[in-house]
Amino acid sequence: MPEKEEFKREYLESIAQNCSKPFAECSRMERYIALAAMIRECCSGVRAETLRRRAANNEKIVYYFSMEFLIGRLLENYLILLGIRDMTAEMLADLGEDLDALLECERDPGLGNGGLGRLAACYLDSLASEDVPCVGMGLRYRYGLFRQRIQSGRQTEEPDDWHADGYPWENAVPSEAVDVRFGGHVERREENGRMIYELCDYQVVRATPYDVPILGYGAHAVNNLRLWRSGPVHKQLDLDAFNAGDYSRALKANNDAEAITCLLYPDDNTPSGQRLRLQQEYFLVSAGLQSMIRTFRSTGLSWEHLPERVAIHTNDTHPALCVPELMRILMDEEGLSWEKAWDITCRTISYTNHTVMPEALEKWPVQLMQDLLPRQFQIIEEIDRRWRESFDTSVPGWHARQQATAVIGGGSVRMANLSVIGGHSVNGVAALHTEILKNTVLSDFYAVSPEKFNNKTNGVSHRRFLLQSNPGLAAYITERIGDGWITAPEKLEDLLAYKDDTESLRELAKVKLAAKEKLCAYIARDFGIACSTDGVIDVQVKRIHAYKRQLLNAFKILALYDRLKDDPDAAVPTSTFVFAGKAAHSYAFAKESIRFVCAVADLVNSDPVVSKHMKVVFMENFGVTMGQRIYPAADISEQISTAGKEASGTGCMKFMMNGAVTLGTLDGANVEIRDRVGAENISIFGLTSEETERYTTQGGYNARECAESDPVLARVLAHLTDNSLGSRFWDLEDALLKYNDEFFVLRDFAPYLAAWDTLAAETGNLSFHRKSLINIAKSGWFSSDRAVGEYVTDIWHIR
């Protein structure tokens, strides 16, 4: 990399080129854009060399299809990966500019929602750092999911215009645009003894790629994230309608095409919403596969070699249409037989399942699929027919198993079944999750094809969530064990040598305090709530959902509130409870949960006695950058989902990496955290997955009985409807008592409160900091470097 003066000269040239005026006259946003453009150009040079080297070595490429890529801000991340963050800060200081202020100009790209998208981004980071050829295939959403606002305690949604000021990291590639076809009908004819299928009277949408460089640590390799934007093939204007004043009809064709990539996850509670969702999924698949095929064709190899040169990975079921679409291309466009096309498809495609909740497994109405994708539906029908015929009818129970695993059933196309049948690998994302898939959710498939199933426990980028997010802790670690952990995170275990070193534990406490001071200053500035830096910082940040049980956390806070109202001198540690996360636009229960948490916050924060001991903060519009502010400061990581419902979770890993101690159920990755840190360095409570499954399938759970037998809980529940919160929450009470508490909030309340009391009382002690250090030391296994290494070896067969 260049020396500072050379770097400064190049930066000022970038200012002149991008802003056409002197540095002193540029706004801070313009200065940021010029710096980002300069770093992107640096990435482009590395990318060209990476492509040349890989082509010479005939390397296999992973195409990672995902509806979400939550990549977060890139400038600081790339300065760190290039090893020039400090030099850049000095260079800017020489020019009278502050790097930290400049970094705040960058907005989080609205390319995802939660763990699914952040996992994909972490994997891209690790694949580039490990020099594994990969192209991420996603959509370039105009307005993302939404920008969350909390107004009078209620979530409201606004469009997230994340690239209103431009996005300097992307590069449009119109020369590689492709056309995607929807609707129409299929005509069949025979030519030279072969059946030809031709789609007629279809609508065409243009897919234009925007490439974002994905830089690996040390700048040894750059991969590509290709985001597709939808639009009309030609801009169309109905002049008659326009001149008649019907402007919406005049632009309808343009608007319909652009709507496909307008928003992430449009509401699918209406037929038009379902249609748009399915259009999104096929648009991604069609555009991505066309791009992949363009690259493969350049090798000159025959199609039989595709599985040797390409791995297509589908991140959840959203890209499941890769199966029939690849079949269509191989048969209809390349002339392969069904048998050859099927063999190639199955050996090329693999699938990650991300849910244990059957209702969350995607299904699409047969009629919708038939209308929107007529040829693909024909292929799906044939896949279904051949699958059904493969069953041995002499085996007892064959019919029930056939019905459970069929692609088409109950008037729907089952995308998870399509993904399992049409690929060579199905993986869960935590050991417990994979066992649940084998034993319940996908048990019939496991009985038929056990060799397809494997576990790949999730991982997160320690370079993003430790090295970048927590520079104080990173320096603390490097001072003791060197910097080898940055590229070999398993070396974090060397920290265990300091677990009984009093001075090191005290230094670790100072690092945590500095992180708390930073977070509390941010909360005071942006949310107007003054929090204590000396007390416990207890955090639950994740998507708002009934099974994630934000209600349970809020009930605990109310129990502590009641305790302090009875006795202001009660032994309740000074605490700040932090919540963040979005509720899906149409998910009423989740929105009501946010309103409830905000009402609890108002009650606690406005009470002159209780607020001296506790504060509650709901931080609106949670995203990657906000998470990076929060993770370093947390003492207690709330991972309290109903056991058996969380596939894995990655927030738990980010908190662990930053020294928080997990308070959680035996669910998802919590199980593996416990196995690595030891039961004494994590706080586990509540029902197990076996117990929740038994209650669900056999009955015997009585929520009302739980409420009536526990006076503390009964008093907490009274807050729901006694107007002490300034409002009544009848729907929440009904969910718990009338509908028997589907997620066992009331059953787990008492052990949860007891576990919190014990853990919170220990924070601040050397024994707690010892637990914290052990968690950091054992977090290396949860790096995405380890996870992608397993995918590379076991699923994609690259090395």
Predicted regions and their residues:
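A conserved ligand/cofactor-binding region detector
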Residues: 1-799
